[in-house]
């Protein structure tokens, strides 16, 4: 069995090497065609990642700008969040068919705080996430939004809409950040944790 251990480096993904790069004009692409590879190399900032990934919607854009402005430099809510997800990954082990980007994105949401984790810990199994085992009675609006977003990512449903994300009364700021971060994980996998506060374009 061949195991691919190749990992992109900043040198591999230099914009000057891209076919969309013109010497006197710079990048001529409307959207970066190699964003996933650049994220893996750790040269993409949070602003670029979010704006390239989340669909543009005027009211939501205003909220996204605040997320970008106040990005703490990590996708994790805190150290406890990181430890909970790492623990759950260790408990579940590795299963190639199960461990998709969407699976990890949902796990990220369901381990984001202690209450939602206790309510959904029994949902994790060898085949994926069985959302029907969650204990949602008397859960907070914040955690309910995270739960529905996690289910959307895994089951490709749309319980949480773009209109919901644009409404602070429906999706609070902390929930919005977590859902946006989970969307990045669903698109780019665990490499999304390499996203920085500022991209390499600020360091030239």
Descriptions of predicted regions:
Residues 143-146:
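Long, hydrophobic alpha/beta structural blocks
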Residues 1-138, 159-204:
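Extended, charge-biased low-complexity segments
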Residues 154-158:
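GHKL/Bergerat-fold ATPase module
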């Amino acid at each position: 069995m061949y195991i691919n251990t190749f990992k992109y480096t900043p040198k591999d993904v230099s914009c000057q090497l891209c076919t969309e790069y013109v010497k006197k004009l710079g990048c001529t692409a409307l959207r970066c065609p190699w964003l996933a590879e650049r994220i893996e190399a750790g040269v993409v900032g949070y602003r670029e990642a979010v704006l390239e990934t989340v669909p543009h919607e005027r009211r939501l854009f205003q909220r996204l700008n605040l997320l970008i402005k106040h990005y703490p430099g990590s996708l994790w809510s805190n150290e406890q969040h990181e430890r909970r997800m790492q623990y759950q990954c260790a408990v579940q082990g590795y299963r190639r068919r199960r461990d998709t980007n969407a699976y990890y994105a949902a796990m990220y949401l369901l381990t984001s705080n202690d209450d939602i984790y206790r309510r959904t810990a029994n949902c994790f199994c060898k085949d994926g996430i069985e959302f029907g085992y969650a204990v949602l009675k008397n859960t907070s609006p914040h955690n309910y939004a995270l739960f529905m977003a996690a289910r959307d990512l895994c089951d490709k449903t749309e319980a949480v809409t773009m209109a919901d994300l644009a409404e602070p009364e429906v999706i609070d700021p902390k929930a919005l950040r977590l859902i946006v971060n989970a969307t990045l994980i669903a698109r780019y996998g665990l490499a999304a944790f390499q996203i920085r506060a500022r991209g390499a374009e600020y360091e030239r």
